[in-house]
Amino acid sequence: MIELRRAVPEDLDCLFEAANSAFAGSTVSGKGPRWKRSREFLGDCLAEQECWCILLDGRTVGGLILFPQPDCLWLEGAFVEAGHQGEGIGQQALGELLRRYPEATWRLKTPAADKRDCHFYEKLGFARTGTEAGHGGQEFALYEKKIF
């Protein structure tokens, strides 16, 4: 059974391990999100932003990182450890988080070359609104979902 729980500082190690597992096999150029590469940055996210643990049978298997902004909720990250990808866990967890904010505009960006990520967000009703150039020429797809 999937459960979504607000993360606390003591969750840092299990979230960091899940993030590294989730992005270990990425075929997209680059080294992954900065919170995947830096335990310190992920710790700052836990202290200053809204982070959620995705639990499967009581064990953390993923996470969601949300940066509330004045005009939107910015989804900085969604990840499920490699051993549980493709099971619908991320879709269930993000769907639950979306339901917790019934009147909001959600935004995110993901590598445009990562077709699996793009498909994941589109399945959840996010609309592609454009692209943005990143470091090293990597292109990011911009997404938005309005819930009212």
Q: What is each model feature region?
A:
Residues 138-148:
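Terminal substrate-recognition subdomain of acyl/acetyltransferases
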Residues 80, 86-99, 119-123:
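Conserved acetyl-CoA-binding loop-helix of GNAT-fold acetyltransferases
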Residues 2-17:
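A short beta-loop-alpha structural element at the N-terminal edge
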Residues 53, 59-67, 74-79:
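Conserved beta-strand in the GNAT
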Residues 41-53:
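A short helix-loop-beta-strand connector motif used in the catalytic cores of GNAT acetyltransferases and
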Residues 100-112:
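Conserved GNAT acetyl-CoA-binding A-motif
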Residues 91-92, 113-130, 135-139:
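Conserved active-site alpha-helix within GNAT-family acetyltransferase domains
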Residues 16-43:
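Conserved GNAT-fold acetyl-CoA-binding loop/helix
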